[in-house]
Amino acid sequence: MNKKKNRLGPGVRLSITLLTVVGIASLLAPLLAPYGPNEMGPAINQAPSADHLFGTDSMGRDLLSRILYGGRASLCIGLMAAAISTGIAMVYGSISGMSRRWVDRGLMGFADLMLSEPQILIVVFLQAIFGKSGYLSLSLSIGVTGWMAMARIIRNEVRRIRETDYVTAARMMGGSFGYILRKHLLPGFLPAVLYAAVSSIGAAMMTEATLSFMGLGLPVAEVSWGSLLSDSQNALLSGSWWIILIPGIVLIGTLIAIAALGEQVRKGNTRLHSNL
């Protein structure tokens, strides 16, 4: 029975396979891409063919090559932003969960206030402060504005764990916050962190795509899936459906696969259903 319960469904297997293929292909973009990401040619707005499997855009650039290189940027920013937001949420949520009630209310009140503000506006404001956009600045802007919901999940888990006998004993023996976090709290809320971290990767990629579509993402010379969609705004008017359809399918498919993987993590730990 347990083996059947833990067996991955076909949807999850397909998601893992898709993410593996996308990740490896993006990582090996310099080896797999038939052309440079910004290399122009005479074939303008050419439909998918033997020379250009995914077609070309209005500047004669190979779409397959740009998707491969764009995947590196989108996945990199998604992973970096998720790591930043997860780190902030772990510390913030743990402190809130272990603090006195009035401190906990104040910290969660601030998190709720931040959560009520449109993330995209805060990211744009931070980008204006950082100046020139780049992988690090975008990841920081998205990461420091995407931790609030995750912090509340972790806080709820910590409040539950803190009442256990072993945590109470560790506190009575003078155990530091860092020791209790490392030895007792982290193993207890790790499943919740894993679910939230996986979900935040997709959210960060979506935010980056939105910024790039608005022209507020990476510089023009850098390619991301969001910038590909931004460049394809006039594609349908010229009948070049592949310029918007193929990158859109790749981005949406990747986001769905990440969401399915996160859902599998949530289902794998039934205790998370009450807090998520």
Task: Place the predicted regions along the sequence by residue.
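N-terminal signal-anchor/first transmembrane alpha helix
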Residues: 1-38, 189-190
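C-terminal transmembrane helix and the adjacent membrane-cytosol boundary/short C-terminal tail
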Residues: 134, 145, 191, 198-199, ...
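Short helix-to-coil transition segments within interhelical loops
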Residues: 56-61, 98-99, 169-179, 183-188, ...
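Generic hydrophobic transmembrane alpha-helix motif, especially the helices
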Residues: 53, 63, 97-98, 103-152, ...
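Membrane-cytosol interface at the C-terminal ends of specific transmembrane alpha-helices
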Residues: 82-83, 90, 94, 132-183, ...
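Transmembrane-helix boundary motif in ABC transporter permease subunits
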Residues: 29-32, 77-112, 124
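Start (N-cap) of specific transmembrane helices in multi-pass transporter permeases
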Residues: 66-77, 81, 116, 152-157, ...
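Non-cytoplasmic
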Residues: 121-124, 133, 193-227
